[in-house]
Structures are given as structure tokens and as C-alpha cells.
């Protein structure tokens, strides 16, 4: 099972591997065992529940690390899961050259959708902004709420 998983992962486009994509290769216990072995061998890095990223040895320490930064992996994960997203407010302001402060947190705006999925690599954690965490005066107004 492990060899079949490894071949499938190597042939996939993108850096993110979802557990549900590998379900056809064996029973849940076999998949769990094979994924655990691949993580311990440094072929994959676990970034969330059922979400793995392709790994490569680090240039300095040789410790396995994801081949892409957390922001890129999170964006690909959201796309694969069908979650609509955009960059967080701080990243948008920086990209639009409205500020010179470099955002150091990985933040995604999910609009009206509440997400509790935890994605992390090491100590870096993806944080979420949505209409529930945004102050009332900064919330997006829906089109139906506009006066006629």
C-alpha cells in the first residue's frame, strides 16, 4: 500500500495531498499506517487533519519540511476543499501598496463562512478572518441589504 501511495503522490500535480484522495488504495487502517510511515520517512508533512504536503529535506538541518510556504499550501488546500477565500486584510493592503508593514501572519478571509480547520507547519498557523470576527462597521454588506 505504501508504494502505491508514494507513486500516486509523486504523480499528482500540486503540493497538497488530501487523505480522501488516497482512500481507494486500501482500508482506512492501511492508509493511516502508510501515511504515518511516509511522514516518518520525510516524504510527507502533516499540515492538518487529513491534509498532507509533499516534503523535501531542509537545506541546513536536513529535517523534512514542506516544499512550499504555508500560505501557498493553505490556498491550495482551500481550493481543493471548495472553500472560497481571499487574502486577509493585512496582506491585501500590503499587496495594494497601501502600507509598508509586512504582514507576518498567514491570514485568509473566508467571507461569511466560519472555518475551524487548523492548518499549521511547526509554529506557523493559518488564521481566519470572516464576517463573524470583523467589527460590525467593517463587515461586507450583502447585495440584498442595500436600500432600493
Task: Outline where the language-model segments fall.
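Nucleic-acid-binding surface
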Residues: 8, 56-148
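Short beta-edge/loop segments at beta->alpha junctions of small alpha/beta modules
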Residues: 1-72
